[in-house]
């Protein structure tokens, strides 16, 4: 089985997953379970259902060695001779489903070992008025589900040198002085606030609108950030950097310089056009 075929099989599997999760979102129970995930968040029934859909679909893909889910404490080994590890957030923004906001699924495809340098592809699906998917091996590519049930290529995606949108997470009272000053500067420059609380939706908007900044900084109540490196942060860092943008944790030059020590590790994170990231680092390093 050739390398290209293996990756195509993974992508096609994610297409099937996206359609199934999209259908579940229309009709499924929005209630909570009696369980918490690895980071202590109470699991929605939709989180568990989405996780189960992903697991069942990937069990049939022999090139996948193991699955690493935000909803599971440990990796699930499925094919001992597989070469890829799929790390994923089955339903990012699931707490917003009850208000009918767009939510999504995030996938990072790692080769042989779960470390930043081994990430070879990133894919996310966004469940909104339309079902869309962004696939990135080299250049991010946008696909949309068509009437005939297939995903049609729409366009390559790229970021401008400077954007206009600002999506900033975290409770403001917990921000550092440097972050507060930086965000004020962006608004003084005319940036528009665009923040829904779903990472996929906010980063998708910035990517499709050509640029801006998404940030989830360290706060007093979450000094190591809240977003998870393997499932959320690195896949989007992979996409943004290949779209011509930049990423940082506020210290390193790139989010790919993070020392990954555990599956559910979190980090402060910033994604955007090069202008915004460079300006942020000026404030953070002052």
From Swiss-Prot:
HAMAP family: FBPase_class1 (MF_01855). Keywords: Carbohydrate metabolism, Cytoplasm, Hydrolase, Magnesium, Metal-binding. GO terms for cellular component: cytosol. It is found in: Cytoplasm. The lineage of its organism: Bacteria, Pseudomonadati, Campylobacterota, Epsilonproteobacteria, Campylobacterales. Mg(2+) 2 binds at residues 89, 92, 232. Gene3D superfamilies: 3.40.190.80, Fructose-1,6-Bisphosphatase, subunit A, domain 1. GO terms for molecular function: fructose 1,6-bisphosphate 1-phosphatase activity; magnesium ion binding. Pathway: Carbohydrate biosynthesis; gluconeogenesis. Mg(2+) 1 binds at residues 70, 89, 91. Its main location: cytoplasm. Substrate binds at residues 92-95, 195, 226. Binds 2 magnesium ions per subunit. InterPro entries: FBPase_C_dom, FBPase_class-1, FBPase_N, FBPtase, SBPase. It comes from the Bacteria. It holds the Pfam family FBPase. NCBIfam families: PRK09293.2-3, PRK09293.2-5. One of its GO terms (biological process) is sucrose biosynthetic process. This is Fructose-1,6-bisphosphatase class 1. Its EC number is 3.1.3.11. It catalyses: beta-D-fructose 1,6-bisphosphate + H2O = beta-D-fructose 6-phosphate + phosphate. Belongs to the FBPase class 1 family.
């Amino acid at each position: 089985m050739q390398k290209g075929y293996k990756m195509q099989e993974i992508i096609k599997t994610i297409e099937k997953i996206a359609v199934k999760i999209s259908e579940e979102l229309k009709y499924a129970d929005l209630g909570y379970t009696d369980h918490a995930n690895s980071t202590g968040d109470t699991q929605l029934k939709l989180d568990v259902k989405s996780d189960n859909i992903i697991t069942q679909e990937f069990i049939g893909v022999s090139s996948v060695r193991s699955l690493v889910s935000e909803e599971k404490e440990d990796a699930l080994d499925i094919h001992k001779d597989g070469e890829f590890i799929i790390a994923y957030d089955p339903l990012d923004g699931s707490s917003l489903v009850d208000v009918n906001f767009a939510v999504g699924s995030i996938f990072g495809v790692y080769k042989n070992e779960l470390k930043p340098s081994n990430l070879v592809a990133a894919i996310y699906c966004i469940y909104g008025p339309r079902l869309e998917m962004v696939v990135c091996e080299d250049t991010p590519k946008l696909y949309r589900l068509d009437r005939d049930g297939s995903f049609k290529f729409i366009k390559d995606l790229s970021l401008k040198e400077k954007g206009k949108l600002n999506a900033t997470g975290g409770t403001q009272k917990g921000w550092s002085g440097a972050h507060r000053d930086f965000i004020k500067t962006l608004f003084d420059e005319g940036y528009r606030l665009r923040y829904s609380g779903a990472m996929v939706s906010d980063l998708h908007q910035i990517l499709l609108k050509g640029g801006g900044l998404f940030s989830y900084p360290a706060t007093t109540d979450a000094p190591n950030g809240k977003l998870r490196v393997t499932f959320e942060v690195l896949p989007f860092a992979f996409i943004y950097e290949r779209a011509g943008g930049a990423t940082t944790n506020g210290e390193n030059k790139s989010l790919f310089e993070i020392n990954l020590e555990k599956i559910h590790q979190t980090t402060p994170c910033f994604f955007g056009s090069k202008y915004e990231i460079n300006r942020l680092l000026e404030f953070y390093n002052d």
